Regions:
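A nucleotide- and high-energy phosphate-metabolite-utilizing enzyme signature
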Residues: 1-317
Length: 317
């Protein structure tokens, strides 16, 4: 699909740039430094949209001392700057905001530092976030971090308190992240029954049941939905509703970006502007006169998906 293809391109850009920095810097330094990256979020799940940032973590081997970590920080900072200016039309935006301690945390950590943080201080949302971690390239250190997350996330089912914390966090996201002045139903990602509802439901089911079933340990939303169906966690009708809404929502997001341009604001919102709505509808295969049919289909699909979400998300035990 498009999301996976975009990830292939992104992987090639990021890994090539990182390798170039390695070659350039190691020509100046006596001691080689090898930085590896792990993808998170939609990047980790291979579900990128056209305007997605690339959420990543940077990791180095435990043998790195303070001087090596300083060099690694400088190199990653330059890598971010290089990629962000690589294209005016669609820059490659590396985002490290999901790293331990957020913006106040180190850009680069050793493997041991990551594992110690997650074992001792991580919050439940960080465990949920790590479900979509993917090692970039073939490096041993990034793969070791991935292997750790598989054990960490699926060591045991969520406790009742952890489940409740995720549920409350979803309430806060719904209340705080949808911009004012927008009909929530028109927000493809964050609106009721939208892509976020599907993702949160899938991840909660994975965290609850993945410790007993390794087939549920996938970063792909599509694959996770299918595995949840096969294991009786979703009925056939629930699966079909979630899968079809997910696919339709992703198609709408891509059409919205193409119709409005990558720099346009509100790219996850079905537009009220007739000209933009017509352009979006025609990209989706509708005629000019069928633009309202596209909107109606989304409203119907997301409403039914919200019913599935309400039934399952608040009653997981």
């Amino acid at each position: 699909g498009v999301g996976r293809d975009l990830c292939v391109v992104a992987d090639a850009c990021v890994l090539s740039a990182l390798e170039a920095f390695d070659l350039f810097d190691e020509s100046k330094e006596q001691i080689p430094l090898h930085i590896e990256l792990c993808a998170l979020g939609s990047y980790g799940a291979r579900e990128l949209s056209y305007t997605s940032d690339l959420d990543v973590l940077a990791v180095v081997a435990d043998s790195c001392d303070a001087n090596a970590l300083r060099r690694a920080h400088e190199r990653i900072t330059r890598l971010k700057q290089l990629l962000s200016t690589s294209s005016r039309a669609l820059p490659v935006a590396l985002d490290f905001a999901l790293r331990p301690e957020g913006k106040s945390g180190a850009l680069v950590r050793t493997l041991e530092s990551y594992t110690e943080y997650y074992e001792r201080w991580a919050q439940v949302w960080e465990k949920q976030m790590l479900l979509r971690l993917r090692a970039l390239g073939a490096g041993n250190t990034a793969d070791a971090l991935y292997q750790f997350t598989q054990t960490y996330c699926f060591r045991s089912p969520l406790s009742d308190d952890e489940t409740r914390e995720i549920q409350l966090m979803k309430v806060r996201v719904e209340r705080e992240r949808i911009p004012g002045g927008i009909d929530p139903r028109m927000h493809i990602k964050l609106g009721p029954g939208g892509l976020s509802d599907i993702q949160w439901l899938v991840e909660l089911l994975q965290l609850q049941s993945g410790s007993a079933d390794c087939n549920l340990r996938t970063s792909s939303t599509r694959q996770a939905l299918l595995e949840l169906l096969h294991r009786g966690k979703l009925t056939q009708s629930e699966y079909q509703r979630a899968a079809s809404t997910w696919e339709f929502g992703q198609e709408l997001r891509r059409a919205r970006v193409i119709a409005a341009g990558p720099s346009a604001s509100k790219n996850d919102v079905i537009p009220s502007n007739t000209e933009q709505l017509v352009a979006m509808a025609m990209l989706m295969g509708y005629s000019r006169d069928q633009r309202e049919e596209m909107t109606t289909k989304w409203l119907t699909s997301s409403r039914k998906m919200r019913e599935v979400f309400e039934k399952l998300f608040w009653n997981i035990s």
